[in-house]
Amino acid sequence: LGEARWRRLNRTFFRDWPSHTPWFREIPREFVHYLSEAEIKQPLPAWLAELAHYEWVELAVDIMDCPMPAHDDQGHLLIGHPVLNPTLMNLSYQWPVHKIGPGYRPRKRQPTQLLVYRDTDDEVQFVVSNPVTARLLAILASAALTGRAACLRIAEELQHPSPETLVNHGLTMLVQLRDQGVILGIRQ
């Protein structure tokens, strides 16, 4: 944006936006709402609201107060019910927000899936994902399914000609997600 445009944008936010919280750490979320909802007169990059959200997510995950649920970290991920990391944010963006910086400004939309979560050392982690993995995690988050049942649901949605092949690939992905800390294990 450049320093002058950035300062002008910040001034209009603090002056015009009716913040809904007095908490200092909530101001970044209010700024995300401002960029997404306000009628801002100055021209802004199309990706700016998503970039602000991506930057806010790191703070949100870092300060989440989520106890870790009971789980068996060595349980079989196809037979058991996978337990997701409670700090996980399974995100989809229209822009490659994780690449935007001083040396890169995207000109075209590029759908991007990212997983953001806090690992066992309380460090915020960012993982580039894909639509199938994002969908698998969404299924696991919304339904009490075994890993196998979730993989079979994906196979059905994709109309995969060989569901068992997809289940085998799904197991590989579930193990990788457990190794990364996205999945903690299975329900006890």
Language model segments and positions:
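Low-complexity, glycine/alanine/valine/leucine- and proline-rich hydrophobic stretches
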Residues: 81, 86-142
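Short aromatic-glycine motifs in intrinsically disordered, low-complexity regions
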Residues: 75-79
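Long, charge-rich, low-complexity alpha-helical segments
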Residues: 1-73, 127-188
